Swiss-Prot record:
Protein name in the entry: 8-amino-7-oxononanoate synthase
Functional summary from the UniProt entry: Catalyzes the decarboxylative condensation of pimeloyl-[acyl-carrier protein] and L-alanine to produce 8-amino-7-oxononanoate (AON), [acyl-carrier protein], and carbon dioxide.
Cofactor: pyridoxal 5'-phosphate
Binding site for pyridoxal 5'-phosphate: 108-109, 179, 207, 233
Keywords tagged on the record: Biotin biosynthesis, Pyridoxal phosphate, Transferase
UniProt organism field: Salmonella paratyphi B (strain ATCC BAA-1250 / SPB7)
Family indicated by similarity: Belongs to the class-II pyridoxal-phosphate-dependent aminotransferase family. BioF subfamily.
Length: 385
């Protein structure tokens, strides 16, 4: 088989099963409204949960820092790219979340990959929730460690896997809020089981940080859990981009030596770090609390209004509200029907989610108003298929 044949066959297979991904060009993709092709849509696809991507205080912080530092960091943090803005943000995050250290990464994908590939060795075992993010599972598969996956949120299955003999160390991997189902992990029980088996716990709280818990400290804080490795990302609740790993002093020093994604990548722009500090200040303020309260009320309004006879609504109380429709083509038709009525929603299909669970992944944000939720419900219940 030639290279071209391999490429063509893979694309043909995706088209045949209605799983071919595509990008949409938008003029505005975050906030209450999405603008594409000159038309305005109510935006139910953005991860900008607190509406901070448009916050004037955060925008101003980025602009002022760009004037001071320029638009790029100029190199890896090990060379010349670790600025006072990066240092300040790391210290603020560590203090906020109660960890000795925080290390910044250019993305959540990079942070997850870096931690797992740096820590895990031959004869080690990774025990991950089967619905863990692709960045976590790919890193586990690429590492020399053995990967075992437990049934989603099934702590008994997790315990059985950890009980089986292992020569090396064990790492339990889970998420705070799951990106496709919108539900939360039983973190307290998972941590208890991990400690009983002398395993470390890694929690990716990409969709919980900033949005839940006291001062927005996330799912782990809310559940009274402190994993050895906490990954937080900044493209959701923070409204910007990037990520950080919270850990002990010694683990931070270890990652600075052996995490190749950190050592060999250009640091995020200092202006981005300063904007993230401004975002953190908003998240921790009374305004941040008000934004979280409004979002929670909108989620409750949506869940109360969905017609359960037409859609399968998962037990999710986060900003992520998936409607399971099952068939790939039906999910695509429903997303298109919503767009025709002015609501932008995304159809999620395999391999992102299991076969037979294609869905509309609806995300609600603080930028929405109650009337927007009512309009979404009206369109959903009137959508012809």
């Amino acid at each position: 088989m030639s290279w071209q044949q391999r490429v063509d066959d893979a694309l043909t297979a995706r088209r045949a099963t209605d799983t071919l991904r595509r990008r949409y060009v938008v003029s505005q993709g975050a906030g209450r409204w999405l603008v594409a092709n000159g038309r305005q849509y109510l935006n139910f696809s953005s991860n900008d949960y607190l509406g901070l991507s448009q916050h004037p205080q955060i925008i101003r912080a980025w602009q002022q820092a760009a004037t001071r530092f320029g638009v790029g960091s100029g190199g890896s943090g090990h060379i010349s790219g670790y600025s006072v803005a990066h240092q300040a943000l790391e210290e603020e995050l560590a203090q906020w979340l109660g960890y000795p250290r925080a290390l910044l990464f250019i993305s959540g994908f990079a942070a997850n990959q870096a931690v797992i590939t740096a820590l895990m060795k031959k004869n080690d075992r990774i025990v991950a929730d089967r619905l863990s993010h692709a960045s976590l599972l790919e890193a586990a598969n690429l590492s020399p460690a053995q990967l075992r996956r437990f049934i989603h949120n099934d702590t008994q299955h997790l315990s059985r896997l950890l009980q089986s003999p292992s020569v090396g160390q064990q790492l339990v991997v889970t998420e705070g809020v799951y990106s496709m189902d919108g539900d939360s992990a039983p973190l307290a029980e998972i941590q208890h089981i991990a400690r009983r088996h002398h395993a470390w716990l890694l929690v990716d709280d990409a969709h919980g940080i900033g949005v839940t818990g006291d001062e927005g400290r996330g799912t782990c804080w809310l559940r009274g859990v402190k994993p050895e490795l906490l990954v937080v990302t900044f493209g959701k609740g923070f409204g910007v981009s990037g990520a950080a790993v919270l850990c002990s002093e010694s683990v931070a020093d270890y990652l600075l030596q052996f995490a190749r994604h950190l050592v060999y990548s250009t640091s995020m722009p200092p202006a981005q770090a300063q904007a993230l500090s401004a975002s953190l200040a908003v998240i921790r303020s009374d305004e941040g609390g008000e934004r979280r309260e409004k979002l929670a009320a909108l989620v409750q309004r949506f869940r109360a209004g969905v017609n359960a006879s037409r859609f399968t609504l998962l037990n999710a109380h986060s900003a992520i509200q998936p409607l399971i429709v099952g068939d790939n083509s039906r999910a695509l038709r429903l997303a298109e029907a919503l767009r025709q009525q002015g609501c932008w929603a995304t159809a999620i299909r395999p391999p992102t989610v299991p076969v037979g669970t294609a869905r509309l992944r609806l995300t609600l944000t603080q930028a929405h108003e109650a009337c927007d939720i009512d309009r979404l419900l009206e369109v959903l219940h009137g959508a012809g298929e």
